[in-house]
Structures are given as structure tokens and as C-alpha cells.
Amino acid sequence: MQSERTITTLSEHACFGGVQGFYQHDSDETGTPMKFGVFVPRQASSKPVPVLFFLAGLTCNEETFAIKAGAQQHAALHGLMLVTPDTSPRNSGVEGADAAWDFGTAAGFYLDATESPWSKHWRMGSYVTRELRRLVLEHFKAREDRIGLFGHSMGGHGALTL
């Protein structure tokens, strides 16, 4: 078993009796620092809780759903943890990554790229389903047997294909 991976707390805020936090870690899958959000309901103080991963759409990031949807209120009521990954690697150094709004940065499509130079960093399918999933299970009271995935727009595509 691998040793526990380190995460950095960027911010944490009281939210509907739980905590909405934003974090960062160095990703093995993308080779870049990655940010993500987690809403932890109060029920997680005494037992592991079910988890829903929300995959955001084009041009979004790990904060979009957390600050715009208001889903924490409902997650708190039902004892659900919400996880919001960023939509792509950022600051990858790949030429052209920031050239268009619908390709590259903020447009990872939750797939693993197969062509160079994208394949080195754009590994969002593996990032969400392997690395971030493990990270959440290691650092938060999450139920491994109760994990769901949903999304909007590009994130809906990701939820259907993953």
C-alpha cells in the first residue's frame, strides 16, 4: 500500500453545519498541482458518509459548483460528501493549452489524452477515478462502497463515460 499523499488546505468555511474546503496536491496522474473542493457534512464527524463527485463543465474549475449551486444545503440534510475536481491540469507548460476556451486548460473532458504533448498531463479520467478517489478516501471520512458521479455539460459527458 502506498503511503498517504499530502494535501494542502487552501481554505475551509463553515457551511450548513459542515465544512466546505478547497485543497491542492501534487498529482501523479497529471504531473501538475491539482485543486479540488470537498463539502464534508456534520455526519462525517462520527462515521464515514456517502460521496458524490460533481464534474463541472467547460471553462469551470473546482469552485464553480461549490459557490454557485447551493448543493451543500441538501448534501448536509442527507449526509452526503460532495467532491469537486478541477476540470483540467493548469500551468502544464504545453504550448497551445490556453489558446482556446474549449480545448486545453479548463477543458479536460474527463478523459485520458492519447496523443503527445497532451497525453503527459491531460489524464483527467484516471485522475478522477483513481487518484482523486484514493485521496478523498485517505483524507476524509468517506464510504468507499457508496461513491457516485454526476456532472453538467462537459462534466455530464465525463460522468457518462467514466
Q: Where in the sequence are the language-model features?
A:
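Non-catalytic cap/lid and distal C-terminal segments of serine-dependent acyl enzymes
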Residues: 2-162
